[in-house]
């Protein structure tokens, strides 16, 4: 991120982290109660999500 600012813990509760069997896969953002927006390379058949990290 160019020119970004540090944020406080729990300031952005819409942050989603995706994990696969190897560990961290990528991150995304919750855009409504059912959909997470991520980058195209975040494609995996088996993953877990953690919201509000």
UniProtKB/Swiss-Prot annotation:
List its EC numbers: 3.4.21.-
How the protein is activated or inhibited is described as: Inhibited by the small molecule serine protease inhibitors phenylmethylsulfonyl fluoride (PMSF) and benzamidine.
- Which InterPro entries does the entry mention? Peptidase_S1_PA (IPR009003), Peptidase_S1_PA_chymotrypsin (IPR043504), Trypsin_dom (IPR001254), TRYPSIN_HIS (IPR018114)
Q: Which residues form the active site?
A: 41 (charge relay system)
Q: Gene3D superfamilies in the record, alphabetically?
A: Trypsin-like serine proteases
Name where it's found: Secreted
Would you tell me the protein name for this molecule?
Answer: Snake venom serine protease LmrSP-4
Biological processes per GO annotation? proteolysis
What family does the Swiss-Prot or TrEMBL record give for this protein?
A: Belongs to the peptidase S1 family. Snake venom subfamily.
Q: Which GO terms describe its molecular function?
A: serine-type endopeptidase activity; toxin activity
What keywords sit in the KW lines? Disulfide bond, Fibrinogenolytic toxin, Glycoprotein, Hemostasis impairing toxin, Hydrolase, Protease, Secreted, Serine protease, Toxin
pH dependence (record): Optimum pH is between 7-8 (at 40 degrees Celsius).
Temperature curve summary: Optimum temperature is between 40 and 55 degrees Celsius (at pH 7). Activity decreases at 60 degrees Celsius.
Tissue expression per record? Expressed by the venom gland.
Q: Oligomeric state and partners?
A: Monomer.
Protein's organism: Lachesis muta rhombeata (Bushmaster)
Q: How is it modified after translation?
A: N-glycosylated.
């Amino acid at each position: 991120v160019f020119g970004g600012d540090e944020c406080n813990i729990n300031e952005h509760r819409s942050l989603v982290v995706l994990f696969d069997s190897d560990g961290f896969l990528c991150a995304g953002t919750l855009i409504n109660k059912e959909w997470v927006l991520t980058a195209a390379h975040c494609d995996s058949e088996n993953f877990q999500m953690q919201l509000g990290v």
